[in-house]
A protein has these predicted regions:
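Long, solvent-exposed, polar/charged low-complexity segments
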Residues: 1-5, 31-34, 41, 141-215
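Residues forming anionic-ligand binding surfaces in small-molecule and nucleic-acid pockets
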Residues: 15, 97, 173
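A contiguous pocket-lining binding segment that forms or flanks enzyme active sites
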Residues: 101-151
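Active-site acidic/histidine clusters and adjacent loop/turn architecture
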Residues: 4-57
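Inter-helical turn/loop segments and adjacent helix faces that build the functional surface
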Residues: 10-17, 108-115, 182
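A short, surface-exposed loop/turn module that caps and links secondary-structure elements
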Residues: 43-70, 74, 139-152
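Amphipathic alpha-helical coiled-coil segments
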Residues: 22, 26, 30, 114-117, ...
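Aromatic- and glycine-enriched beta-alpha-beta binding-site module
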Residues: 60-123
Length: 215
């Protein structure tokens, strides 16, 4: 309810009057969920070197563009620390007034990284298809992201969306009527993230590949 109220009353006076609600019902539980999931993912996948980051509710004053000073959503991510965060894959959770979302994505990969991923698909399409099928088999996540206006190639229908992505995320949206900030939610997100770990490692490992002949 707080996030709906903030969406409809996005101004400083309203936020300050309801700040305790934000801290108690949104910010605190989100940080606790991030802490618990970071601990579980680190236990399961210590080699990933995951570190959590929780977003701030305050918008950057330089980028308001006529919007209110506060975000009406909150998110956290788990990723290996990097100089440019958006260039590395991360596991994420986001809560908004009407939904929550979770999954894995890479929102600002360099063109070189995506070229290396395409080269991996060219060298070993069977490995790439296996990873894609592992995700598709569950039917839980949808591949989202911007595609190149001019396709880079056609490796077949299964790999085509990945091959021609400029950025990507595997995302699941849920309405807010189910379990919320509970152990059940924590377990649901954790079980959703687990089958995405091989794809995350595959994307991250591509950064160490040699530069391909073609971008």
């Amino acid at each position: 309810e707080f996030l709906w109220g903030l969406r409809l009353n996005n101004e400083r006076g309203w936020f300050l009057a309801h700040k305790e609600e934000f801290l108690t019902y949104v910010d605190g539980p989100t940080r606790e969920l991030a802490r618990e999931l970071t601990a579980e993912m680190t236990r399961l996948y210590p080699q990933l070197g995951l570190v959590s980051k929780v977003s701030r509710i305050y918008r950057d004053a330089r980028r308001l563009y006529g919007r209110g000073p506060y975000k009406d959503h909150l998110w956290f991510s788990l990723r290996r620390p990097a100089e440019h965060e958006g260039a590395t894959p991360c596991f994420f959770f986001e809560v908004a007034p009407e939904r929550y979302s979770y999954g894995m994505g890479c929102w600002d990969p360099t063109p070189l990284t995506m070229a290396k991923l395409r080269a991996r698909m060219d060298r070993d399409p069977a490995e790439a298809e296996k990873l894609v099928r592992q995700v598709a088999r569950r039917g839980e996540f949808q591949l989202e992201g911007e595609s190149y206006k001019r396709p880079k190639g056609d490796p077949g229908p299964l790999l085509y969306p990945w091959y021609n992505s400029r950025q990507f995320s595997l995302c699941r949206d849920e309405n807010c009527e189910g379990p919320y900030f509970t152990a059940e939610l924590r377990d649901r997100v954790l079980e959703g993230w687990k089958p995405l770990a091989p794809a995350s490692r595959w994307v991250e490992a591509a950064a160490a590949d040699p530069s391909p002949d073609h971008m």
